[in-house]
Each structure stands twice: as structure tokens, then as C-alpha cells.
């Protein structure tokens, strides 16, 4: 016997999600529970995969098996497909393993043609219902299978209602609906160039194909990418005998949740509509009634429904989202699934289910999607306002939250406008470190270029600001302070609203609501901390960021980028003097001005972290990022150095590099200018000694991290400068304070020679942004230009800068840990790239034995929860 592709509901169960999809598995499970489910069958996800393997056709064997199961349905129902005495009508629905918005809409009443309509009209003595079913079927099939837009049919309905002087669809009579059905068929022929199919088998195969096709539509692909759903899963198709909610006033249809999906409060929440079918409830054609009103209309069916809700919630031990139909007072269940919910509701439901004895703490931790916690920590758009808003463009949702403000085009303007009380959105082609003060002053940041790990994205996430990056549809005119998007021109001072979670951009003002964290958040986080192994640190460069991260549960700083400190107004001038100096003495003199300021920065960080570990990365970016670009600043620098403007411009020109990300940066700066490493070491050690003196009970052990090491000899050279300087400072202070010198692993060669590097490094920290960039040979700032094409061609399913590439980059990490720990068993390893806040990447870090992950402050709760889930899934508690 060949492979089985089709299963009756009675042949499946709730554990078969991979094969039957979520909807099919749940229909089978409800059947097994003895609930009133219209019977049918599920075509498996493997049939979908086969459809694509066969070149997007349903092969004859699978078609034959489907028709064999139609015959089985005929036996169960006593009706026949396409029959002119007792015809069988079916619905066709998609159903992937995970709930997938954007997949194909439902098709109802399949199996109808004009002859069958006449039969059911006579048989039921209800011609209005019969023609209503047919016109709905033509509309759904045309829209969903043949992609003839709904609007053409809606226009015909509106015209008919106008002619008849009525306002609701239900007020149209049988003759009106018959006329509409004929108009719909004519519209179909005009658009498609062929007659509407009358053969039920042709209709069925067309609908099944449409479900398979929808697995690969652009909406589904984007949703899959955002939610880690592999393309290889495929979707199942459910074919179910019809239950009719549109046969009269003793019929109806509804959607309900066993708890409120917005708040998590226990109690039935949903809507119901009499004499209606399928999508009518959610389509908003008529105003539905609250589910509680169903009790007056259909007391028997309502009582049964309340019992079913109770059975299903207890069975699945989770909040259920259900669809049902009432036909002549009799209840039929069409679907159940774990309901989608807000982050706030997810926390409340998880806690309540533990209190009700339905779930253990570990199970409750596993119920919550870590990524959804983002929405708890940032402002969001008002739910009603956003529902009626239409985006004018879309970029990448690079840093969550919602923001609304007046457009400005420079960091200086952002600061100036904020100073006078304006709320602004900073719009840039791309951002650079010198834009930081302007980014801080803005409600949100919008960039034309750059990906999920671009400068704008990383900095915005660190600050907890909203950011949409890489909106390449924007046509920028910086000189005239304007841009165009979505066919409209926007000037400085115009209002726009941006959503950093979805990447959507809106014209005008959309009101926002502040984030609220309820008591359940703390409770779930306490459970997460109880079960996780991985430590969670933060990437923070300022005391404000550090304090925020600590508040959100960070256990130390895994990355302090010292370069951001150089951009402050009181020190950039001195640093520029250092860059333009001719001798070591001149450079040391300029650095001496920065030393007390940098020391002060570090003292504040140590104070904020109260004895938790602090890892400080020495200067990383190339020097050209620090030099002035404005004429006035160049003149100022020339005057301070006693040089001509031309000489300064020549120095600036000499710093230009063809490939700066692989150029004169990281440890290479410390090799060329050891005095920079010396000054930074003094600042770190003096700050630590002062903090220790003020708080002798704190554990202050500085961790100094050398970036971009590719060769053991580089590390030896820089480490000697650090150790000689640090030891002298500690000795002079009469202290015995300990410190560590470690390295970033961000060049593939460092991972490959990790055994050598571990002989000098006391800790490894994986800088996965650069490691990904160098392993793939992609520039992270330019990859957005071609990644879309890679997604379409199915080369990539995810952005490797947002989700760690476990097979390539991950292999290098595993290798480095193994080699390093062989040489130095006490070696502690962490990750401080943006991947540290991505749940699937955190799970991988747990699996390969990292000691900690470090991420931006607002991602700390996400990492804590993801780390707990990784440990629980691994069965370590």
C-alpha cells in the first residue's frame, strides 16, 4: 500500500499536529471527546510538501485518495457529492501546525451549482437560504481560489441593496439573491474568461490547490520568518461537511474564547450572529451580539456550548478560541485552538492556570512567547486607533514600541526641537555614532538603509526607543529636508507615526498608550529565574541603561562599548586632538584630558551595578568615525592643534578606508596606538579601586575585553600593555583587587585557534554581529539590499543578523568553547551580539554550554524567560 495522505477525523488525535496541522488535529481530538463536530477528513501536510515537489500539482494518486475519502464522508452523512437528490456540501479550510494569519481564507458551501441549489431549495422549502449559500460560495471561491477581489462582489451587493431600498444583506429575498448569484457568475466570467466551475470535484481540487498555494504567499512567508515557522512544515487541508447558520432565525454562528484574550480574565468572551455564516461575525457586516445574549435566543444550544467550553479548556489546559454554528437550534463545533492573546493576558492566564491547579510552574513558563514581553515594556498604539489606520510604508521592525512625532532630519534638530518641548521622529538615510544625542532626544527613529543589527537598530534597542529601519521605499531629499513615501511628500515638522514591532509607518498622529507591568510579570519572571541555568547580562554604556537593565533583572554588564563615551561633547574635541597628533607625547597629552572623564563614566557604571560583573570593551570602531565633517568643527580642530585646515583635511582623508569594518579598528588600534589601551586601562582600574574603597563589601573585579582578536600574538601584545598598566595602578593603591583580561571572539580565525587564544584570555565573549558578518562575508549594513531576494528564492528563511545561524556561526562557537575549555577549564564564555536577546538563539547558547547571554536592557526579560524555557525543554529540572 502507498503512503497515506488523508485521514478521517475519527482516525486522528490531538498529538498529530505535524501531520494533520493544528486545526485537523483538534477536530480529530474534539471528535474523540464525543463533541458535536460535523464530520470530514484532513489532507496531511505531507500532501502539501508533495504538491510542491510535483511542481505545484496534486498528483493523481493523492486526488484518487481524496475522492475515496469523499465516498467515506458520503457513507457517514448519508448525502452524496454533486447529487440531485440529497447533495453533500462541504467547507474547505487551511490548517498549518502553528496558527498562521495570512493563510487561505475559508471556503463554505462547496459542491453547489444551479441544479443542486434548486434541489436544496425544494428539499428545505427555503429558497432564500439556498441562493444565499450559492452567492456566498461563488464570492468565496472567486476571491480565495481564483484571486478575483472581494470588492467587485461587494459592489454588486451594495448596488442590489440600494435598488431594493434595504441596508442589510439579510433583508434581500430569494429572488434578489438568485439574481446576485447570476451577476456574480457573469463577473467571474468577465474577470477569468471562463465559466464558473459546476463540477464539484473540480471545485474541490481547485480549493485544495489554493490552500497549498497560500502556504507560499508573501503574507505567509513574512509571518513565518517573524515567528520561526519553517517553510518545510507545509499546511494541511480540512474538508468538513457543512453545518448551516444561515437557514433562518433559529440558526447562527459565533466565535468565542474561554477567557478574555486582552486581559486574561476568566469567563466567556465572544460574539454571535443569528442567520449568518462563517466570516459574517468577524467581517463586521452586521453588529454581532455578545455571546451571553445567545442564552435568550438558543437556551439549549447555549447550555451545551458552556459545557463544551469547560470540557475543552480542562482538556487542553489552556485558553481556547472556538468557532461554532447553530443549525435549527443544534450546536456544531467547527474549530478549537489555543487562543492568541496579548502579553498581559498571557501572563495572567499562565498564573491563573497554576493557581487553578491546571498547570505546573514549568508548564506556565513554557506557555509564554518570550518575544511578546517586548510589548509590555514599550508604549503601544491605541488598539482602536491602529485598527482603522492604513500604513503608508513598511520597513523592518528593528526596535519595538510605538512612536509619534514631528519629522526632523538631523540629530542637532532633534535636540533643538526637543529642547523647546516638541516630540520628534528622527528620519535618516542611516545613523552613525555621532547621531546618538539626537536619537536620545527622539521618540523614534526611521532609517532608509540598514537591517535589524544596523547602528540605528542596536542603539535604539539599547535605549528602549522605537526604531523602523531599512524602509527602502522612502525617496530622501536631505538637502531640502523632505522625503516622499506612499505617493505623498513629507516635510520637516509634519507628523508621522511608526511601529517598531511591525515596521509599519503611518501618516499623521496615532495616539499611544504607555506600557503597564502588572504583578503577574514579576511572578512569571521569578519562576523563570528559578529554572534557568544561563546568566543574563546587559549591553549598557550609560548608568541610566545599566540601572534600567538591573531593574529588569540583568545580572551584570556583558558589554560596555567605550566608544559611545567618546562622542560626548566634553571629550570628542580632546579625542580628535589625539587622532590628529604627530607624536606619542602629543597623543598622551590629549588622552590625559579624557582619562578623568572616562574614569568617571566607569565609576558610575560600577555604582549602578552594585558589585555585579562589568565587562568593558576597549575602543573598537575605526578612527574615521570620530573625525569632524562640518567645516566649523574642522576649523576648531585646526586651531586647537596649531595646524592649517588643509593639514587637518589631509589627516581626515588619510583615515578613509575602502572597507572600514575590516580595517583599522578593534585591537589593531591598540597595536598602533598602545597609549589608547593604556589610558583606558587606567580609567577602568582607577574607577574600580575608587568604587571598592567606597563599597568594600561589593565584589568589584573588572573584566577588560579586547575586541577583534584574530591572532594570539595580537592578544599577547595588547594584554601586556593592559597588565603592566593595571598591575602598576593596583600596586600604587596598595590593593590586591583582582581583574580579568579576555577577548571578543568575532573573527572566524579566533574561533579556529581558540585553544591558543585561551592560553592568554581569561574569558571569551562571542560578538556574533561581527562573527556573522565575517563568516558569511555579508556587510550587516548592506545585507538588507539582497536578503529579500534570498527569502523569495528560499535560500534563507531568516536574517542571520537577527537569528543566529546555528549550523555555520554556531559551529564556530561550539568549536571555540570546546577548544578554549580544554586549555583553560575555568574559561567563562558569553555572547554579547544582538542575538543574546533572540529566544531561539538563547536556546542554542544554553545547549552549547555558554555561561551567560548579554543583550540590550529591554530584552533582558525576554532572555531570562527564553533561558528558562531552554532549561525546562532540556529536562534539567
Task: List where the protein language model places each region.
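C-terminal domain-closing interface element
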Residues: 334-336, 491-539, 545
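Conserved alpha/beta-domain cores
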Residues: 93, 517, 527-877
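Structural motif
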Residues: 238, 408, 425-427, 446, ...
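Glycine-rich phosphate/ribose-binding loops and adjacent secondary-structure elements
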Residues: 329-332, 429-440, 444-446, 452-458, ...
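Protease-associated
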Residues: 358-442, 504-510, 521, 525-529, ...
Amino acid at each position: 500500500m502507498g503512503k497515506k495522505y488523508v485521514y478521517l477525523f475519527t482516525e486522528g488525535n490531538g498529538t498529530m499536529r505535524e501531520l494533520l496541522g493544528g486545526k485537523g488535529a483538534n477536530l480529530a481530538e474534539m471528535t474523540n471527546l464525543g463533541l458535536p463536530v460535523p464530520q470530514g477528513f484532513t489532507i496531511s501536510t505531507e500532501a502539501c510538501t508533495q504538491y510542491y515537489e510535483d511542481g505545484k500539482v496534486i498528483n493523481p494518486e493523492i486526488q484518487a485518495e481524496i475522492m475515496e475519502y469523499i465516498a467515506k464522508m458520503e457513507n457517514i452523512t448519508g448525502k452524496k457529492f454533486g447529487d440531485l437528490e440529497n447533495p453533500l456540501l462541504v467547507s474547505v479550510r487551511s490548517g498549518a501546525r502553528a496558527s498562521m494569519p495570512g493563510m487561505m481564507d475559508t471556503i463554505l458551501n462547496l459542491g453547489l451549482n444551479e441544479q443542486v441549489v434548486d434541489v436544496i431549495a425544494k428539499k428545505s422549502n427555503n429558497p432564500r437560504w439556498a441562493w444565499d449559500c450559492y452567492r456566498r460560495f461563488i464570492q468565496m471561491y472567486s476571491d480565495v481560489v481564483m484571486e478575483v477581489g472581494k470588492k467587485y462582489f461587494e459592489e454588486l451587493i451594495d448596488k442590489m441593496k440600494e435598488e431594493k431600498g434595504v441596508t442589510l444583506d439579510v433583508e434581500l429575498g430569494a429572488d434578489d439573491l438568485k439574481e446576485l448569484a447570476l451577476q456574480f457568475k457573469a463577473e467571474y466570467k468577465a474577470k477569468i474568461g471562463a465559466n464558473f466551475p459546476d463540477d464539484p470535484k473540480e471545485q474541490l481540487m481547485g480549493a485544495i490547490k489554493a490552500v497549498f498555494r497560500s502556504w507560499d504567499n508573501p503574507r505567509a512567508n513574512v509571518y513565518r520568518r517573524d515567528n520561526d515557522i519553517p517553510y518545510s512544515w507545509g499546511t494541511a487541508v480540512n474538508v468538513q461537511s457543512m453545518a448551516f447558520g444561515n437557514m433562518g432565525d433559529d440558526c447562527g454562528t459565533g466565535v468565542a474564547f474561554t477567557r478574555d484574550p486582552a486581559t486574561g480574565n476568566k469567563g466567556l468572551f465572544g460574539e454571535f450572529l443569528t442567520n449568518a455564516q462563517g466570516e459574517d461575525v468577524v467581517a463586521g457586516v452586521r453588529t454581532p451580539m455578545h455571546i451571553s445574549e445567545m442564552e435568550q435566543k438558543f437556551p439549549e444550544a447555549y447550555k451545551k456550548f458552556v459545557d463544551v467550553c469547560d470540557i475543552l479548556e480542562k482538556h487542553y489546559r489552556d485558553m481556547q478560541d472556538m468557532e461554532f454554528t447553530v443549525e435549527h437550534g443544534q450546536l456544531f463545533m467547527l474549530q478549537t485552538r489555543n487562543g492568541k492573546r496579548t502579553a498581559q493576558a498571557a501572563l495572567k492566564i499562565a498564573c491563573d492556570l497554576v493557581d487553578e491547579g491546571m498547570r505546573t510552574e514549568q508548564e506556565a513558563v513554557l506557555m509564554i512567547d518570550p518575544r511578546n514581553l517586548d510589548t509590555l515594556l514599550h508604549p503601544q498604539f491605541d488598539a482602536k486607533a491602529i485598527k482603522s489606520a492604513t500604513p503608508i510604508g513598511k520597513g523592518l521592525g528593528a526596535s519595538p514600541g510605538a512612536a509619534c512625532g514631528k519629522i526632523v532630519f538631523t540629530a542637532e534638530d532633534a535636540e533643538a526641537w526637543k529642547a523647546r518641548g516638541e516630540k520628534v521622529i528622527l528620519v535618516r538615510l542611516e545613523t552613525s555614532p555621532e547621531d546618538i544625542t539626537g536619537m536620545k532626544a527622539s521618540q523614534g527613529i526611521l532609517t532608509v538603509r540598514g537591517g535589524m543589527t544596523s547602528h540605528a537598530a542596536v542603539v535604539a534597542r539599547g535605549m528602549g526607543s522605537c526604531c523602523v529601519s531599512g524602509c527602502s521605499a522612502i525617496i530622501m531629499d536631505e538637502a531640502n529636508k523632505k522625503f516622499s513615501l506612499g505617493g505623498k511628500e513629507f516635510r520637516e515638522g509634519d507628523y508621522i507615526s511608526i511601529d517598531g514591532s511591525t515596521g509599519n509607518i503611518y501618516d499623521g498622529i496615532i495616539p499611544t498608550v504607555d506600557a503597564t507591568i502588572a504583578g503577574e510579570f514579576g511572578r512569571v519572571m521569578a519562576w523563570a529565574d528559578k529554572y534557568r541555568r544561563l546568566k543574563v547580562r546587559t549591553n549598557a554604556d550609560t548608568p541610566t541603561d545599566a540601572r534600567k537593565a538591573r531593574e529588569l533583572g540583568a545580572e551584570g554588564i556583558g558589554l560596555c562599548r567605550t566608544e559611545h563615551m567618546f562622542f560626548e561633547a566634553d571629550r570628542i574635541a580632546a579625542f580628535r586632538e589625539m587622532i590628529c597628533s604627530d607624536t606619542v607625547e602629543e597623543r598622551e597629552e590629549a588622552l590625559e584630558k579624557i582619562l578623568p572623564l572616562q574614569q568617571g563614566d566607569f565609576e558610575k557604571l560600577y555604582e549602578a551595578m552594585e558589585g555585579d560583573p562589568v565587562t568593558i570593551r576597549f575602543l573598537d570602531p575605526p578612527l574615521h568615525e570620530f573625525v569632524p565633517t562640518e567645516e566649523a568643527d574642522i576649523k576648531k580642530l585646526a586651531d586647537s592643534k596649531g595646524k592649517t585646515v588643509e593639514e587637518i583635511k589631509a589627516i581626515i582623508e588619510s583615515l578613509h578606508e575602502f572597507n572600514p569594518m575590516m580595517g583599522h579598528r578593534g585591537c589593531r588600534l591598540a597595536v598602533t596606538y598602545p597609549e589608547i589601551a593604556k589610558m583606558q586601562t587606567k580609567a577602568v582600574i582607577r574607577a574600580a579601586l575608587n568604587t571598592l574603597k567606597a563599597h568594600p563589601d561589593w565584589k568589584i573585579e573588572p573584566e577588560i575585553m579586547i575586541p577583534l582578536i584574530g591572532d594570539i600574538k595580537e592578544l599577547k601584545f595588547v594584554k601586556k600593555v593592559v597588565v603592566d598598566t593595571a598591575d602598576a595602578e593596583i600596586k600604587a593603591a596598595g590593593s590586591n583587587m583582582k581583574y580579568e583580561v579576555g577577548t571578543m571572539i568575532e573573527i572566524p580565525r579566533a574561533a579556529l585557534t581558540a585553544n591558543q587564544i585561551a592560553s592568554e584570555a581569561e574569558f571569551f565573549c562571542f560578538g556574533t554581529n561581527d562573527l556573522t558578518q565575517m563568516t558569511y562575508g555579508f556587510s550587516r549594513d548592506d545585507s538588507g539590499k539582497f536578503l529579500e531576494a534570498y527569502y523569495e528564492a528560499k535560500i534563507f528563511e531568516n536574517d542571520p543578523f537577527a537569528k543566529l545561524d546555528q549550523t555555520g556561526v554556531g559551529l564556530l562557537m561550539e568549536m571555540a568553547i570546546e577548544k578554549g575549555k580544554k586549555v583553560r577549564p575555568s574559561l567563562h564564555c558569553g555572547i554579547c551580539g544582538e542575538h543574546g536577546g533572540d529566544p531561539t538563539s538563547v536556546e542554542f547558547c544554553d545547549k552549547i554550554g555558554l555561561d551567560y547571554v548579554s543583550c540590550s536592557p529591554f530584552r533582558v526579560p525576554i532572555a531570562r524567560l527564553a533561558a528558562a524555557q531552554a532549561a525546562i525543554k532540556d529536562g534539567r529540572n
